[in-house]
C-alpha cells in the first residue's frame, strides 16, 4: 500500500479499458468487401450451420462477421456494412453484417423485429 506522499508524487493510474471491436477503429459501423462467404458450426452444446463471411474493412483489417436472419444474397466481392456484436457460440466472430444496407438485402417475409433485419413493412 502506498504512502500519502507516494500518492501525491505519482497518483493512481486509471486502468485503460480494452475495446471489444478494435477493427471498427472507434466507428459505429464500417464498410467492407466480402472475401469469403461460408458456413461454420457452433461450439458445444449447439448444432447448426451458421452463415459467416470474411470481410476486408475500409480500416484495412480483415474480420469474420456473422450474417443474421434466414437466407442471404451475399457472395464474394459484395459490399457490406459491419457493426460490432459478438455471436456467443461462434468463437472469433465479434462482428455482424447489417441487413438491408448496401449490397445486403433484408430478410423476406419478416413480420416482427423487422428493423434488425432490414425488412420493409408489408402492404396489407
Swiss-Prot record:
Keyword line: Methylation, Ribonucleoprotein, Ribosomal protein, RNA-binding, rRNA-binding, tRNA-binding
InterPro entries registered for this protein in UniProt: NA-bd_OB-fold, Ribosomal_uS12, Ribosomal_uS12_bac
Organism field: Acidothermus cellulolyticus (strain ATCC 43068 / DSM 8971 / 11B)
Positions where 3-methylthioaspartic acid occurs in the chain: 89
Protein name, per record: Small ribosomal subunit protein uS12
Gene3D superfamilies: Nucleic acid-binding proteins
Pfam families found in the cross-reference section: Ribosom_S12_S23
GO MF terms, alphabetically ordered: rRNA binding; structural constituent of ribosome; tRNA binding
Function comment: With S4 and S5 plays an important role in translational accuracy. Interacts with and stabilizes bases of the 16S rRNA that are involved in tRNA selection in the A site and with the mRNA backbone. Located at the interface of the 30S and 50S subunits, it traverses the body of the 30S subunit contacting proteins on the other side and probably holding the rRNA structure together. The combined cluster of proteins S8, S12 and S17 appears to hold together the shoulder and platform of the 30S subunit.
UniProt key word Ribosomal protein: yes
Bridged cysteine pairs (disulfide): none
A GO biological process held by the record: translation
Assembly and interaction partners: Part of the 30S ribosomal subunit. Contacts proteins S8 and S17. May interact with IF1 in the 30S initiation complex.
Taxonomic superkingdom: Bacteria
One Gene Ontology cellular component annotation held by this UniProt entry: small ribosomal subunit
Region of interest (Disordered), ranges: 1-32
Family: Belongs to the universal ribosomal protein uS12 family.
Compositionally biased tracts (Basic residues): 9-18
Lineage summary: Bacteria, Bacillati, Actinomycetota, Actinomycetes, Acidothermales
Amino acid at each position: 500500500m502506498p504512502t500519502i506522499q507516494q500518492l501525491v508524487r505519482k497518483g493512481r493510474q486509471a486502468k485503460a479499458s480494452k475495446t471489444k471491436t478494435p477493427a471498427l477503429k472507434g466507428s459505429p459501423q464500417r464498410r467492407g468487401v466480402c472475401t469469403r462467404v461460408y458456413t461454420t458450426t457452433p461450439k458445444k452444446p449447439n448444432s447448426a450451420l451458421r452463415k459467416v463471411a470474411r470481410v476486408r474493412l475500409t480500416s484495412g483489417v480483415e474480420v469474420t462477421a456473422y450474417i443474421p436472419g434466414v437466407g442471404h444474397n451475399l457472395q464474394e466481392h459484395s459490399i457490406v456494412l459491419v457493426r460490432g456484436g459478438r455471436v456467443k457460440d461462434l468463437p472469433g466472430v465479434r462482428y455482424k453484417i447489417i441487413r438491408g444496407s448496401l449490397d445486403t438485402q433484408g430478410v423476406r417475409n419478416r413480420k416482427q423485429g423487422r428493423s434488425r433485419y432490414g425488412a420493409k413493412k408489408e402492404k396489407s
